[in-house]
Amino acid sequence: MVDKRNHYFLLHKIEELLELSASKYKTTMEIANYAKKTKNRNANKSNIKPVILAILEISGELKLNDINKLTN
């Protein structure tokens, strides 16, 4: 017979993993969409890849003005 404490513990861990997975997917999609906009806006004016620019801006490491300076 399955111990109910283990059963609830496993269910809790599964829920945690699903939430983390959904959060990572959401973040990945935000970065990808932002990178697509950045790529379209800057059209190969920079040696910095759009995904890296997106990560830096979303994380707060760079502001839009800084990115424009890098890509011009």
From Swiss-Prot:
GO biological process, one term: DNA-templated transcription
Record's GO cellular component terms: chloroplast; DNA-directed RNA polymerase complex; mitochondrion
Record GO terms (molecular function): DNA binding; DNA-directed RNA polymerase activity
Primary subcellular site in the record, as a coarse category: plastid
Signal sequence segment: none
Protein's UniProt name: Putative DNA-directed RNA polymerase subunit omega
The protein's enzyme class: transferase
Subcellular location field: Plastid, Chloroplast
Role: May be involved in RNA polymerase activity.
UniProt keyword Transmembrane helix present: no
Name of the gene this protein is made from: rpoZ
Domain of life: Eukaryota
Source species: Cyanidium caldarium
UniProt keyword terms in alphabetical order: Chloroplast, DNA-directed RNA polymerase, Nucleotidyltransferase, Plastid, Transcription, Transferase
Chemical reaction(s) catalysed: RNA(n) + a ribonucleoside 5'-triphosphate = RNA(n+1) + diphosphate
Keyword Plastid: yes
Family label: Belongs to the RNA polymerase subunit omega family.
EC number, as in UniProt: 2.7.7.6
